[in-house]
Amino acid sequence: MDRYLENIEHKAAVLCDALPYIRDFVNKIIVVEYDCGEWLSGVEEKKLMKDIVLLKSIGVIPIVVHRTPMGVDKFRENKRIAKMLELCGTKALGICGVDVETLHMTISNDYIPVIVPNDIDNEMEYIDPKDTALEIAVKMQADKLIYLSRYPGIYTDET
């Protein structure tokens, strides 16, 4: 019983500490870019989706940009991530590429946009999702841009 009360007290303390930040980010756009499950286990990826849904439920406007692992159909991966968000309790819509009007419409209809970078031909050219996330953050005047990576700090290819 003591452990149960300690757990509740801990959760209450965390929530109290978070309240000022929650207020600061209500109705603010946050773009989150991550490498789809390539370095996250299924359990960790589901926790990430729950965290994104939590952000939305407290009034933050998340936009998700993802990378598709090699050999995986990018449209199928996009649908998978949108479905994961829906299973966590929110509406999500898979979108290809960057179109500000579509993003605004998606957000205004209470959906989380889930974006896969898309080349013009839909096939050949690799587009870095970090570049797409940055482009979206700028065009949507996002308040935060978050890159989730397996690398600590900022990774640069020194080769």
Question: What name fits each language-model region?
Answer:
Residues 29-33, 106-131:
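Catalytic-site beta-strand/loop segments enriched in glycine and acidic/polar residues
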Residues 45-50, 126-133:
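Charged helix-capping and loop-helix junction motifs
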Residues 54-58, 87, 135-143:
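Alpha-helix C-terminal capping segments
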Residues 71-119:
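Ligand-binding beta-strand-loop-alpha-helix segment within the catalytic cores
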